[in-house]
Structures are given as C-alpha cells and as structure tokens.
Regions:
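Acidic/glycine-enriched connector segments
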Residues: 18-96
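Conserved small/polar residues in nucleotide/adenosyl-binding loops
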Residues: 105-112
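Extreme N-terminal starter segment of soluble prokaryotic enzymes
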Residues: 3-5
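Active-site donor-nucleotide binding/catalytic segment of nucleotide-sugar enzymes
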Residues: 8-13, 37
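Short acidic-hydrophobic, aromatic-tinged amphipathic segments that line or gate anion-handling sites
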Residues: 99-101
Length: 116
C-alpha cells in the first residue's frame, strides 16, 4: 500500500539527542496515522555539515523539496518559530494542507502509558 508523504516540522530544541528523540516520536505517530514521514532533521545531518554555509543552504533546499513532494505538512510541538512559520507559509502557497500542532510531551506521556 502506497502511503502519502507527510512533511514533519517542529521547533527543534535541545541537544542533538533530544531533537532526535522528539523527531522519532513524531515520525512514528505520523507513520501510525498512515503517512510516510519526511523529516529533514532526522536525515540531513548524516551527510550535510550545517556549519558549512553552502551545505546549510543545500539542507534548506532539500527540505523545501521534501515539502513540495508532500501531501500534508504536520506541525508538531507546543511552539512555533520562524522556521515553522516559513514551512506553513510555503505549504499554503503550494496548496498543501497543514495540521494543528501535536504535543511531544503529550505523545511521550501517552506512549509511556500505552507501553505499561
């Protein structure tokens, strides 16, 4: 069964491992909702160096291409920053549906209760 792409965005805060944990939880929930999650924060750092200006720009361009190919933009978390606002604005220009936020804290609490 072919699942539509869903671009996952959020305010990514904390250290590298915290961000990876947040993104992994969000992507799992998106997958369980019937989508194929596209989350640049989980993928791009494996081969791009954000400290190199050209690679930083390439990362932004790759992320935008992921969004263009997505059917839905999923905004996760409890906060909105400029990056998330830009993702929402681009999705609107492209006619891509954007969801309401999903709380990482709520998902972790639910996941913990569910696992018991």
């Amino acid at each position: 069964m072919k699942k539509p792409f869903a671009y996952v965005t959020a305010v990514w805060q904390g250290g590298e491992f915290t961000v990876i944990d947040q993104a992994t939880v969000y992507c799992r929930k998106v997958y369980e909702a019937g989508f194929t999650p596209l989350c640049p924060v989980l993928y791009l750092p494996h081969f791009l160096r954000d400290s190199v200006p050209a690679e930083h720009k390439d990362g932004i361009d790759i992320g935008r291409e992921f969004l263009r190919r997505s059917r839905v933009l999923i905004v996760c978390g409890d906060e909105i920053d400029e990056t998330v606002k830009n993702d929402i604005a681009m999705a609107q220009r492209l006619g891509i549906t954007a969801t309401t936020p999903v709380s990482y804290t709520h998902l972790r609490a639910h996941e913990t209760r569910h696992d018991l």
